[in-house]
Structures are given as structure tokens and as C-alpha cells.
Amino acid sequence: MSKQPSLSYKDAGVDIDAGEALVERIKSVAKRTKRPEVMGGLGGFGALCEIPAGYKQPVLVSGTDGVGTKLRLALNLNKHDTIGIDLVAMCVNDLVVCGAEPLFFLDYYATGKLNVDTAAQVVTGIGAGCELAGCSLVGGETAEMPGMYEGEDYDLAGFCVGVVEKAEIIDGSKVAAGDALLALPSSGPHSNGYSLIRKIIEVAGADIENIQLDGKPLTELLMAPTRIYVKPLLKLIKETGAVKAMAHITGGGLLDNIPRVLPQGAQAVVDVASWQRPAVFDWLQQQGNVAENEMHRVLNCGVGMVICVAQEHVEAALKVLRDAGEQPWVIGQIASAAEGAAQVELKNLKAH
């Protein structure tokens, strides 16, 4: 008989009971997000979903994303209740720009040691995000991987699938000189630029938990969840049929994201003076001595979504968006690009 102690999975750092406890805690979260097309609940090997009724030639649209190093800030601040909203937003906002309605969402949560309370907070946020987007949380993977992550640190990834009518895909091909560009405000930096943000905080030696901007704690401004634009944009598409292109302003800011939906020969002329930049961006620029162009290449600077419509549809589009609770404004227009010109021109950049 061997005198060696009998080892278990728990001895190796994996607690199966904790994983099962988490599944029980999040079943109600998934249930709240359920769409009629989803067949079955959590716990199966795969999630089943029908194509919604009414589509003649449905095209599935997929996307995956994370929340970048905003997660590090969440871990440092021990604030886990809204990072799941960020995760959903990063995926569904990317889907809606081509006109797709998000159908279902899955998440991947990897950690060194599973803290059930933390994970439940994260997944509850994911559920809240799915409700805001109108999609179902149909499953996910929780991986406890000792030796891969430090303690209870965790990483997140999200995966989303949506559907759009083939004839109604929005791809930017109809964008023409003279079209107007509308903008929807962001809630803050959303989920991009946090490596720069964290570097600024470090170099400035800023105590972000004791700094207030416009009467709000800086931590609240930095951790504000990414806005989910799905329902207002689907309403705009359905009620006006006027949307030619949309750009989700993520990493790369206005300068890198608008060109992704422009046809060759088109240039977006954006008036930076058309909106009041939120104070959090001015604070970051001052503390980090960040060049103005760099600000617009890394951060959204207060703009979460840009929408292209023909000039004659501007007023109708603004009205639909306002009726949906948004605060849109005209941010610029499309021009013909001169030979060798950048696809985005920022007008009225302030001197730094």
C-alpha cells in the first residue's frame, strides 16, 4: 500500500463544488435574458437557437471581444458589478453597425482561483448587458486554472451572434460626398485605452479614489460601463431606412474606426468643436501631457458611435434617436478625399 497521500483535483487548486455553486447562482440571470428562439436552458453541451421568424434570407453575424486592461482597474478597485456590461457592449455594438440584431451571447471567464461571489457579480453584469441589448445569455465557460493566473485575478472574453436580412446589410458602400455624420455620446472611455489610462495614473501618482470631476468620483467616471446602442440604432434603421454606415468608436478612436466603414475616395470631416469633451478626458490629457492627435487615436473622447445618413434624412434621424432616449448631434460630413489625404480629417483640434 502506497504511503503517498491521495491527491484530489481540489489539492491541485480546482474546486469543482465552487464551479457548480456558481452555475446555480447564475441560472436565474440567464433565464431573465431568454429570447423565444432559444431552445433549452444552461447546462447542456451546446446551446440551441432558431433563426427568428420573418427573415427571408437571414445572414448570421458573429463577433468576439474582451474588455482590455479595464479589467486590471476593476480588479484593483474590487469593482466587478459592471465589467460584464462592458463585455457585452463591446461585442453587440460591433454587430449592430452592420444592421444586425444580436441573438445570443456566450462568455469565457478564466481565473487562478474561483471566487464565486466575484464571478457571480461579473455574470450578473453580463446578464444586465444582454437585457439592454435584447440578446440571450445561452452559455459560457468558467475555467479555474491554477498557475496560469495570479490568485483570484481573472480574464474575460465574450462571443455574440446576431442576424440581419441579406438585402439590409449596412456596409458603407452607399456612403457619398455630402452625407451627414451623426454622433452618439459615450459614457466615458468605455473599454479602450486603459493601458494608457493606467500609465497616466501611475506617472501622475494620482489617488483616483479621492479625486472628483464635475461632482463625481474619478473612479466612477473611469469605470462607467460601455454604453449599449443596440435598441436605439435598430429603431433608427427600422423607422427611417436611412442609415448608410455606422462606426463603433473603440480602440483607435475616431481616426481609426470611421475609415473601417468608408468606401474608397470618401473622407469624413469631423468637427471636434461640435461637442463638449467630458472632463475625464481633459483630466487624462493634462495629467499625461497627451498630444491632441494621440487622444483621438486612442480614446473615444466622448463619442461612442458615428452614423452616416444623407443630408435630407438628418432631422428625421435625430428625432428617432432622441425619441429613443439618445442625445445625438451632427459631428461632421462626408467629403471627396483628395489624392493621398487621410480618410478622417479632424477640424478645430485645440492646440496642445
Swiss-Prot record:
One of its GO terms (cellular component) is cytosol. One of its GO terms (biological process) is adenine biosynthetic process. The keyword Ribosomal protein does not apply. It is found in: Cytoplasm. It holds the Pfam family AIRS. Pathway: Purine metabolism; IMP biosynthesis via de novo pathway; 5-amino-1-(5-phospho-D-ribosyl)imidazole from N(2)-formyl-N(1)-(5-phospho-D-ribosyl)glycinamide: step 2/2. This is Phosphoribosylformylglycinamidine cyclo-ligase. The lineage of its organism: Bacteria, Pseudomonadati, Pseudomonadota, Gammaproteobacteria, Pseudomonadales. Its EC number is 6.3.3.1. It is an enzyme of class 6 (ligase). Keywords: ATP-binding, Cytoplasm, Ligase, Nucleotide-binding, Purine biosynthesis. Belongs to the AIR synthase family. It catalyses: 2-formamido-N(1)-(5-O-phospho-beta-D-ribosyl)acetamidine + ATP = 5-amino-1-(5-phospho-beta-D-ribosyl)imidazole + ADP + phosphate + H(+). InterPro entries: PurM-like_C_dom, PurM-like_C_sf, PurM-like_N, PurM-like_N_sf, PurM_cligase. SUPFAM superfamilies: PurM C-terminal domain-like (SSF56042), PurM N-terminal domain-like (SSF55326). GO terms for molecular function: ATP binding; phosphoribosylamine-glycine ligase activity; phosphoribosylformylglycinamidine cyclo-ligase activity.
